[in-house]
Amino acid sequence: MKKFLALLLALAMTLSLVACGGNTNTDANQGGDDANTDGEKTYKVAMICDSSINDGGWGAACYNAMVKAAEAKNWTYEVTDSISQDAYYDSIVAYCALGYDMIYAPGNQYTDAVLQAAEEYPDIAFALLNGAEDTPAKAVNGNVSSLLPNAQQIGWIAGALAGLMTESGKLGFIGGMELDTTKGKIAGFEEAAKYVGEQEGKTVELLPVVYANSFSDAPKGKEFATTLISQGADVFFGDASAVDSGAREAIDAANTAAGSIKIYDIGQPADILGQNPCIICSQVTDNAAMIEVCMDAVVAGNFGGTTVFGTLENGGLSAGAINTELVPAEKVEKYNAYLQQMMDGTFMK
C-alpha cells in the first residue's frame, strides 16, 4: 500500500514538473553544460531532506554538495526538502519510480527508509551520508553505500578552537537528534576542548547536551542557546541544521545586548564565516568529493557495499576560514598547529 501511494506521489511530481518547471515542491536542474548533448545516457541524482536547503546550515551544505558533484559529473539533479519523518520512504520511492539512478540521503536518520527502498529497487544506487559503517552490508541487493565523515575528527576541529577561545570554561552543544554520528561529534568536541584548555591552563567543561528532536525547529535552537548562555556557555557547536541557525540568533542577540562579541559559534558542515557576527570558524566537510566517488561507481557499474570515508588526512574534513577580528593571531597560530597534529596523528598524544 505504501509503495502504491509512493507511485501516486511520483505521478504527482511528474505532473508538477511538467506544469511548473520543477519549481514548486522540488528543484530540478541540469547538472552540466554538456549533460544532454553527447548522445550518451544522462544520469540523474535526487536528494531528500527533512530540513530546508535554505537553512544556512546542514540542509544547504548537503544540497550544495550534491549540486557541485552533479555539475562536475554532468548529472542532472533534483531535491525534495522540508519533509516529515513519515514521508522519508514515500519521497525516496517517488524518485525511484521516476527512474533516478542514485538517491542521496544526507543523514543517518534515513537509514530504515533507504534500506527498505533499496530492497524494492535493486537497480538504483542509494548513497547514505552519515550512514553507519555496517549499513551497506544490510542491503540485500548490495546497492547501498555509506558516506561517513570521521565524527571524532569533526568534533576535534571544533573542540580545539573552543578550548582556545573559551573564557568562562563552559561550552554548549545543541543536537538535532540523538544519532550515533552526533554522539561521536560530541565526544570529539568535548575531549579536544578539554585537552586544549588544559594546555592553556584552563578547566573546560561541556554543559549538558540538549536535543531538539528536529532539524528544522529554529525557535527551539534559540531557546536552548539562550538557556545555555544563562548557564555560562561562551562557545557553541552543534549538529542540528536550522536549529543551529536559531541558536546563532540567540548568540548574536546576547552579544548585541552586551555591546561586544564575547560569545562565539563554530559553524558546520560548510564554511559559513560571515553568515552571523558570532561565527569564528567552521568545520568543513567535503561531501561533494564523496558523492562524486559514488557517481563514478554508478557509471562504472560497481556501486554499493562500501563505505566512503572522509577524514582530515584525505581532505574530506578541514577547518574553514577564521574570523581574525575575533580570534587573536597567537590563537590562530596555536589552532593551526593543533590541526596539523590531528593530520599527523599526534593530537592528544
Q: Language-model segments: which ranges?
A:
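Residue-level detector of alpha-helical hydrophobic segments embedded in or interacting with membranes
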Residues: 2-3, 117
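A residue-level marker of the well-folded mature domains of exported/periplasmic proteins
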Residues: 20, 28-349
